[in-house]
């Protein structure tokens, strides 16, 4: 960048955060009563509350606010996530689907929108991806901790008392029973089928077509466009422009969500939650 601007190595660059840039977007078109909200979803997806990633409770509340805010005429959902919890992704997707019933929802992929990050985009009217975005990864996996060998080497044993065969399917010391493995496998397979089902609905494809490119395969944005997993290759600005077109807006302002909170606000919020 310094070379392009004919600056010396020691010269400082004046920088602006992307959220500030978006907030000042297209000043000539600003109209306070017509707002396009850019909802940022960055990081892994988790259940519960938190501020350093995508937490389902926080995001569900944020989406509901956007749904009920009459000034917000359209939402651009900016996703930059490798995925995470299936349950949390489900909660977010459901709320996005409710939002879409009231106003246009356009998705814009950042550097990556994979697995759950792709899944939560399935409630959108249209998906924009950058050519080099890492996306797809339509798949599900589960992990069960097993310390049986470590326990054996250290002479640790456990003697479970149970009421039926399924009461102790998983033990950190004794491992997983065949029944437990079977149940876990069925759960993962069921979640995968649900994932593919939502993709088939949004992308207007058959189960077989999505399954063929699923199984956890990671794709570039360009490849995803070729096989119909995204609608257009484009930037965040392209998504905003389309959202304005979809909402029939000529004058509007753009606002970034969720609103940033300071470290002190996070601290006091956590204290309130602990009480």
Segment roles from a protein language model:
Residues 1-130, 134, 141-275:
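N-terminal organellar transit peptides
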């Amino acid at each position: 960048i310094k070379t392009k601007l004919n600056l010396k190595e020691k010269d400082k660059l004046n920088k602006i955060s992307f959220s500030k840039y978006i907030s000042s977007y297209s000043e000539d078109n600003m109209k306070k009563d017509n707002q396009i909200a850019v909802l940022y979803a960055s990081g892994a997806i988790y259940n519960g509350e938190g501020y350093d990633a995508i937490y389902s409770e926080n995001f569900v509340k944020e989406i509901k606010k956007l749904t009920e805010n009459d000034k917000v005429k359209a939402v651009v959902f900016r996703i930059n996530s490798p995925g995470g919890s299936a349950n949390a992704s489900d909660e977010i997707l459901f709320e996005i689907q409710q939002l879409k019933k009231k106003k246009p929802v356009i998705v814009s992929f950042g550097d990556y929108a994979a697995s759950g990050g792709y899944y939560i985009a399935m409630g959108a009217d249209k998906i924009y991806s950058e050519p080099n975005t890492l996306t797809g990864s339509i798949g599900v996996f589960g992990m069960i901790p097993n310390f049986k060998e470590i326990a054996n080497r250290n002479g640790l044993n456990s003697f479970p008392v149970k009421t039926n065969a399924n009461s102790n399917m998983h033990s950190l010391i004794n491992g997983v029973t065949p029944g437990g493995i079977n149940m876990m496998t069925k759960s993962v397979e069921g979640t995968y089928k649900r994932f593919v089902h939502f993709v088939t609905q949004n992308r207007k494809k058959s189960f077989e077509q999505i399954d063929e490119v699923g199984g956890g395969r990671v794709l570039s944005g360009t490849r995803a466009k070729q096989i119909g997993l995204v609608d257009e290759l484009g930037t965040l600005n392209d998504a905003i422009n389309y959202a304005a077109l979809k909402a029939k807006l000529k004058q509007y302002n753009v606002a970034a969500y969720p609103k940033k909170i300071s470290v002190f606000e996070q601290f006091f919020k956590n204290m309130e939650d602990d009480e």
